[in-house]
Design a protein with these regions (language model features):
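Surface-exposed, low-hydrophobicity beta-strand/loop segments enriched in small/polar/acidic residues
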Residues: 5-8, 12-161
């Protein structure tokens, strides 16, 4: 059945509907992490044309070590091609407790790098596969381990032409 293309109530109607019907893609690795995750994990398959607009990464515990700072680097791919020009990074900061951290800009956490979406590589089509990875670097036996790395990939639809 062909997709209905209009007339629509407004120029941003598809975005409004997608905001309700297209929740963000989400992924989590449950538990403590002290080694690379071992590859990419599927976030889902796109059911509409769209683009990635924001990526937020979080950990329930950022880890702690006196040497070799625990650091987690995230990445997002569309059909195997990275969609980020700068991946989000969460790192322990000396003197801080092993605490929850997020790259959400409003949180104001320290030791983080916010994701920058590559506008030349962020579009996806129906059937495209979105995936993510998490890579840990730092001490193999930290005082506190990094735990529960999670990612939220927010998208907007691309209106029909």
């Amino acid at each position: 059945m062909p997709k209905y293309t209009g007339p629509l109530p407004g120029s941003d109607f598809a975005r409004q509907v997608a905001g309700v019907n297209l929740p963000p893609f989400r992924g989590t690795i449950s538990g403590e992490v002290v080694a690379a995750s071992g590859g990419y994990f599927t976030l889902g398959v796109a059911n509409i044309r769209g683009k990635i607009v924001r990526v937020v990464a979080s950990v329930s515990t950022a880890g702690k070590a006196d040497s070799q700072v625990p650091t987690g680097t995230f990445n997002v791919r569309i059909n195997g091609t990275t969609a980020l020009s700068t991946p989000p990074v969460i790192a322990h900061v000396s003197g801080e407790a092993a605490q929850h951290k997020t790259t959400w800009s409003e949180a104001g956490d320290t030791g983080i790098t916010q994701a920058v979406v590559n506008n030349a590589a962020c579009d996806f089509g129906v059937g495209d596969i979105l995936s993510w990875s998490f890579a840990y670097t730092g001490s193999d036996s930290p005082t506190a381990k990094m735990a529960n790395p999670s990612i939220v990939v927010e998208t907007d639809p691309i209106p029909p032409v």
